[in-house]
């Protein structure tokens, strides 16, 4: 039987990794030869979850057409966020919870996108719809994905469906969601030992906003000053990325997991759009974004609207 690769976006977060594992397992249970893979490094937060539930992380690939003809995308759909040679393979399915952009296929596909906080929430439904029992370890990873994407249920992207799914999965995984979740988020917020290049690419996504090419990277921290003390070095590596990729804006967002506020560091010729979008002044290229924790709901649509205005 021909193999199908299942993967999330580049610079994968916990949902991208864990949903690839969970969905590949469901597809295998349903008779498909599916393998989860990843398009980037595993973050400290994700590694904490993998270690806790004793699951091996997916192998890394840069290209997919050299291995398979067919792939399944989870937690993304935009071409620039996917495998480098995504145009050379057939996308069979997409399971996602983001905006749909820069995506088209030559054949009809199974496309499931729901306005929930996490791909794993959708997968929880799909396991039940197909009558497949979720293994304890996989339930733990799916729970981890929801906790990560919802910032332990505090993000505005978090829905009642996400909370309900998390409670179900926590029971299967036999963990206390709140206690486990806080430990996992703290592990993800430990940025010690990271280079500046790693910091700006840990969770970075590229977007087309009107005619502008924008990259938004986000890291969680217990104290934003722990990251911003390196601002001069960060600006240097971000400026290099802006030049290399021809970006109009690179927005580096540092989110405080305790206060649920963020600080944005804006570099590029369109940095002023951040001021317009949030009605805040940039001082020394930074601005405090009160109550902003979600790239998907509070940054991407706000900036997109500002660029298109």
Curated annotation (Swiss-Prot):
Localization per record: Cytoplasm
Catalytic function, reaction form: diphosphate + H2O = 2 phosphate + H(+)
InterPro entries: DDH_dom, DHH_sf, DHHA2, DHHA2_dom_sf, Mn-dep_inorganic_PyrPase
Residues bound to Mn(2+) 2: 15, 75, 97, 149
Binding site for Mn(2+) 1: 9, 13, 75
Key words of the record: Cytoplasm, Hydrolase, Manganese, Metal-binding
Predominant localisation class: cytoplasm
GO cellular component: cytoplasm
Assigned EC number: 3.6.1.1
Single GO MF descriptor: inorganic diphosphate phosphatase activity
Matching Gene3D superfamilies: DHHA2 domain (3.10.310.20), inorganic pyrophosphatase (n-terminal core) (3.90.1640.10)
Signal peptide: none
SMART domains: DHHA2
Cofactor binding note: Binds 2 manganese ions per subunit.
Xref: Pfam families: DHH, DHHA2
Keyword Transcription regulation found: no
HAMAP family (UniProt xref): PPase_C
Family: Belongs to the PPase class C family.
Protein name in UniProt: Probable manganese-dependent inorganic pyrophosphatase
């Amino acid at each position: 039987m021909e193999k199908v690769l299942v993967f999330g976006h580049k610079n994968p977060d916990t949902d991208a990794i864990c949903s690839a594992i969970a969905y590949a397992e469901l597809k295998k249970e349903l008779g498909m030869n599916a393998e989860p893979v990843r398009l980037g490094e595993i973050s400290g937060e994700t590694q904490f979850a993998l270690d806790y539930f004793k699951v091996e992380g997916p192998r890394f690939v840069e290209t997919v057409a050299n291995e398979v003809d067919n792939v399944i995308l989870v937690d993304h759909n935009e071409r620039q966020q996917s495998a480098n040679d995504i145009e050379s393979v057939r996308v069979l399915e997409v399971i996602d919870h983001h905006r749909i952009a820069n995506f088209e296929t030559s054949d009809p596909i199974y496309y499931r996108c729901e306005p929930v906080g996490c791909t794993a929430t959708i997968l929880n439904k799909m396991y039940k719809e197909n009558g497949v029992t979720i293994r304890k370890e996989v339930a733990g990873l799916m729970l981890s994905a929801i906790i990560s994407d919802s910032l332990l249920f505090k993000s505005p992207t978090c829905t009642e469906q996400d909370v309900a799914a998390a409670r179900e999965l926590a029971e299967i995984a036999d963990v206390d969601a709140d206690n486990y979740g806080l430990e996992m988020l703290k592990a993800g917020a430990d940025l010690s030992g990271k280079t500046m290049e790693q910091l700006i690419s840990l969770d970075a996504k590229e977007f087309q906003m009107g005619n502008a090419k924008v990259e938004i990277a986000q890291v969680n921290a217990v104290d934003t000053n722990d990251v911003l003390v390196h601002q001069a070095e960060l600006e240097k590596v971000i400026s290099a990325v802006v030049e290399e990729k021809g970006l109009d804006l690179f927005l580096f967002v540092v989110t405080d997991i305790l206060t649920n506020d963020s600080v944005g560091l804006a570099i590029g010729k369109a940095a002023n759009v951040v001021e317009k979008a949030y009605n805040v002044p940039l001082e020394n290229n930074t601005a405090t974004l009160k109550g902003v924790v979600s790239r998907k709901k509070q940054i991407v649509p706000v900036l997109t609207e500002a660029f298109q205005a």
